[in-house]
């Protein structure tokens, strides 16, 4: 049974997104970029092996999630910074939803964790469904269905 009616899987936006973002480390790179990381060494600092980081950054750039910007420090060779594109920044709600889900269903007993907050007041915020009229819709009223592609 295929409740969404999508054949083949390549037509499903979830499957297509996971082809890129489901690779180990990809969303962690985006998380670090949202937090301000731009340089290879910044991303490498979270424990990603260099060869894997190179592949993931290339995939994210090729997909339009990140862009390379050349820079050169005095006396150094030219290198690239990596910055989120608008498509990359549009992943913030995805990361925020994962923060909420992971905090709720995979809690850690102690230490530090992540929380979604506003940039100015650091007030806690939550991911929500909002209709075109701006009304917040309860999750039990939301489903995923097939519609004609745009």
Task: Spell out what each predicted region is.
Residues 1-11, 23-24:
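Recognition helices and adjacent regulatory flanks at domain boundaries
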Residues 1-2, 65-72, 90, 94:
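Short, contiguous, well-ordered secondary-structure segments
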Residues 12-52:
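N-terminal helix-turn-helix DNA-binding core of bacterial DNA-binding proteins
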Residues 22, 73-95:
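Basic, amphipathic "hinge/linker" alpha-helix immediately C-terminal to the N-terminal HTH DNA-binding motif
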Residues 38-43, 57, 87, 91-95, ...:
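Extended, folded domain segments that form the structural surfaces/walls around functional sites
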Residues 44-69:
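Canonical helix-turn-helix DNA-binding module
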Residues 96, 100-150:
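C-terminal regulatory/oligomerization modules of transcriptional regulators
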């Amino acid at each position: 049974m295929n409740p969404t009616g999508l054949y083949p899987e390549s037509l499903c936006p979830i499957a297509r997104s996971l082809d890129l973002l489901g690779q180990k480390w990809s969303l962690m790179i985006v998380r670090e970029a949202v937090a301000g990381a731009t340089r290879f060494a910044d991303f490498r600092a979270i424990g990603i092996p260099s060869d894997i980081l190179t592949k993931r950054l290339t995939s994210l750039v090729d997909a339009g999630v990140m862009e390379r910007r050349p820079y050169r420090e005095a006396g150094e060779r030219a290198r690239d910074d990596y910055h989120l594109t608008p498509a990359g920044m549009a992943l913030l709600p995805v990361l925020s939803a994962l923060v909420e889900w992971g905090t709720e269903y995979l809690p850690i007993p102690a230490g530090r964790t992540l929380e979604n907050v506003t940039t100015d007041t650091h007030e806690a915020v939550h991911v929500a469904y909002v209709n075109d009229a701006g009304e917040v819709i309860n999750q039990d009223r939301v489903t995923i269905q097939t519609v004609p592609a745009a």
